[in-house]
Amino acid sequence: MNEFEIDNEIEITDETELTYDLIAQLKKKYKKIWKTTLVDGTEIVWRRLNRKEYKQIMKDYEDIENRGERLMEREDAVCRAAVLFPRGEALEEIIEYMAGASSVISDDIYEKSGFRVAAPEEL
């Protein structure tokens, strides 16, 4: 059984179900969390990336020469860093078997992490 401790009080395993109690615990820890529902109904709960995490992800994959491959690896890494539920093998299966899932989820994560803050306003 893969276990990923988000903190000492919140433990997510492959058997963990998304409940109101779990959502409340995650909100208490991260303040703001979001949910993306994939086309098959799978619910993905995630948080924002912070600047340090973003910079590390960019650095970790900068040596991949192929731009498309580099982008896909970064999208997967963003999901692994920010997705709170599901975790472990369940998340890896989503990334592996739903080709566009990490792209969709990472786009949502980027948006709420400040990469599309607001539309410019003419003065």
What name fits each language-model region?
Residues L26-W34:
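A short, compositionally biased
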